[in-house]
Amino acid sequence: MSTNLQAVNEPVRSYESGSDDRKNLQIKYDQMASEVVEIPLIIGGKEVKTDEQGQCVMPHDHHHVLGNFHMAGENEVSEAIESSRLAWKTWSKTPLQKRTKIFRKAAELLQGPWRDTINAATMLNQSKNAFQAEIDAACELIDFFNFNCQYAEDIHNNQPLISPKGVKNSLEYRPLEGFVFAITPFNFTSIAGNLPCAPALMGNVAIWKPASSAVLPCYYLIEMLKEAGLPDGVINFLPGSGSKVGDPVLTNPNLSGVHFTGSTQTFQHIWKTIGKNIDRYKTYPRIVGETGGKDFCLAHESVNVDELATAMIRGAFEFQGQKCSAMSRAYIPTNVWERLKSTYLSELDSVKVGSPRDFTNFMNAVIDKNAFDSITEYIKYAKNSPDAEIISGGTYDDSTGYFIDPTTIITTNPNFKTMEEEIFGPVLTIYLYEPADWEKTMDLVDKTSPYALTGCVMGSDKSAIEKSKDRLTHSAGNFYINDKPTGAVVGQQPFGGSRASGTNDKAGSELNLQRWISIRTIKETFDTPTDYRYPFLEED
């Protein structure tokens, strides 16, 4: 199979004031905000409704209901597994060319008629501003579709085997035998789409459980995939609780893989559950997960102060710090802080927090009440600690929306609680170190947290940067030099980390797709032996 279709990154729309793009998105936002959508399960292409329902709300106006989604129970899970089994019989044998045609069509739909719908749903249900929605729900997911199709073709075209005379050796890239369980997070619509679609592209079937706090954009994605031509049952859509959906799925003998993004604790529970049931499965399940992070910024004394201030504000506070890659701890030399502090605080003071409908708001609301309570507990802890000082923010209000102002903590303790634990909110903790302690500080960066997802080092001293790159080899799966630790782009920076941050299977790369295939080696012999005797058996 060959193709001349080379993927390119989707251009990011700017949505500047007065532009048609901005006006159209605002119209779609207002239209969807005025509706209350009923969201069914999708099993075998059919809408399924249940007695138990959950609500889609605006985090920035949590009394405003956007939709009611039906929740799966034991019966619906059983139906979905059976639907997946039946769909697998046909889909697993569907030629790659037909599969890529469907997902390239999905990319075209998202580039065009579905773009405003998916972006607006993301803004409304996840409280993302227009730019954050655009780079996620539109551009990144379009890139996932297009680049994954190219990578899948590259995989299938790869036949590296030697074939001696009279023999033909080949590799067959089969899908897994069974179904993949895709468990998706609230924070990225693109990841929510990619987790079931990447295995499906490789010929697998998937059961998709979206995060309950972000069902709305996921529902529109499954509708868009249907329009793109995805056959019924290839991806079954099952909103519901973790226990009612996850427990029966994870113990089913036909489970062939798990594609997960979420908390480290949940991923560890999944892994333990699979381990306890390992003798039940028809095949060993592939386990792919991207989990938590405690992402760092290490500044060298040679750093440009303006660049550092911008990286800190964007890296820590875009999308309210609810990115697995968000900067959460920073190590700043004391002599840099003297110059940085006023610039950083002045810039931070200009940051506006509010509804994404107001395009001048840089930050919006955190996702839900549980997140709000968890994040503010860390702020309260810092306020009451002799080892910490809050120098910005520290204020919050959940009366209308779950709003938390960008909060900066200075600590004298490099092992302070907010330096070690994942907060997943707009809280950045800074530890000031003496420039002479550069080497010791690299050790702190490496050893303070169990995570190893992203991190950045900033400075103009090339020798120091090279030394940090070597010393922090296993501290981050995505390592940024003179840039914030967020914003990985498909086709440019494959994303993932190790240690407590996941299996580092690099979403948006060929490496991830290889987890969803089971290779068969085929040897065809044209001159088959007819005598068992080898020459060495001859008598002297």
Functional labels for PLM-detected ranges:
Residues 49-51, 57, 62-156, 442, ...:
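Glycine-rich loop-to-alpha-helix module at the N-terminal edge of alpha/beta enzyme cores
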Residues 123, 142, 152-307, 504:
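Rossmann-like NAD(P) dinucleotide-binding subdomain of oxidoreductase/dehydrogenase enzymes
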Residues 2-4, 10-14, 61-67, 86, ...:
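Conserved C-terminal structural/oligomerization subdomain of aldehyde/semialdehyde dehydrogenase
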Residues 63, 99, 122, 203, ...:
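Residue-level signal for inorganic ion chemistry
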Residues 224-229, 251-253, 257, 264-414, ...:
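ALDH superfamily catalytic-core signature
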Residues 58, 70, 134-137, 184-185, ...:
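Active-site proximal loops enriched in glycine and acidic residues that flank catalytic Cys/His/Asp
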Residues 1-65:
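Hydrophobic face of amphipathic alpha-helices that form TPR/SEL1-like repeat modules
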Residues 129, 165, 206-209, 294-298, ...:
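Short beta-alpha connecting loops at secondary-structure transitions
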